Amino acid sequence: MLLKKPSYPINNSLLDYLERFDRISKVPIFYDDLLRFSGSINVYDKHDQDTLWVRVYYTEFERSEIDLTLMKIYSLLHSDGNLGIIKFLNVDSIDYCTFGNSKPFRIKVRNILNDNYTHFYIKRADASRVYGLELEHILSPDKINFLVYKDTLIEEHIMGIAGDVFIKTLLADCTETEKSQIAKEFVKFNERCMIRLLGDMRSYNYVIIPIHDFDQVVYRIRAIDFDQQCFEGNFKVYRPQFFKENYPMVKLVKDKLQHSSIEQYKDEVRAVLAKRIHSAENRIKRLLQIMGSDVISTDEHLNQLKLELYSYTNDLNFKKAKSMGNVMSAAFEFITRNFKNTNLFNTGF
């Protein structure tokens, strides 16, 4: 069982980095302000199951002020701060999550002209999560939008079907071809998480995204929680295949894919990551330098992880690492140096 991760503050070097890449909110917003709600009711899904979210309410004066701030935040996320769109927006709901580490607020903003709506989240800013978000933006197939204001983090909503919901309600109805494609995507997702040391990817921490092509439906798997970036010491935590919640996906891989295909898909991930690391070399170097001098885990976790990685790779750079940022640098150096070798990490599939 994973221990609750503490929240690590964002240091000045990381703030300077975020400023350089337009990640600082121009609109003041504080997570603690949203905690001053005067009441709440439980939110249930369409099957009348408790979602562990509550819908919160504020006094009339506070609500009008909060709504205006949230609409300005929306304009920053989606239209580069164009305040002209605010007159077409309405904050339909503010929900608070009672489950998990970050206890986020989920904001629903609706366009009153056509009833289209979108969500974003307000959380306490945490250095681990910010590093995870930034690495996701640079290295993953999908870009991600987020902003920071002092000790508050604003994250866009990542659309998709929660992995646990998909596994429970939709996986069995997929065609055999679709199951093979999902197995392939899980292998790739597993490899990406392992290489970039994104931990705790249980089925409820990622989404599955169906994409309708002209003659088929294909599926993508995307992380939605970046709290466990480079924190845990156990290397298995960074490999989704070892969580019991993901067993149906692991079984799918074993049932549908041959070993040679698994190795091929893992190699494809390494090749793509190596190219992305090279193409964003300056930005990644700058981020990893800051990460290398930051504290985002415990000494116990650091020592455990670097020795486990050394035993897997025989790369002395892991053993010499003085911080989790150094471990991340060693991992990226290792992958760019050796990505053509199909036996880099033995993931156990």
Where do the PLM segments sit?
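Regulatory N- and C-terminal appendages and interdomain linkers associated
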Residues: 1-80, 299-349
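A general structural signal for short secondary-structure junctions and capping/turn motifs
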Residues: 4-9, 97, 112-113, 144-146, ...
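Short C-terminal domain-edge/linker segments immediately following a structured domain
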Residues: 137-140, 151-156, 185-188, 239, ...
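Conserved kinase catalytic-core segment
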Residues: 173-235
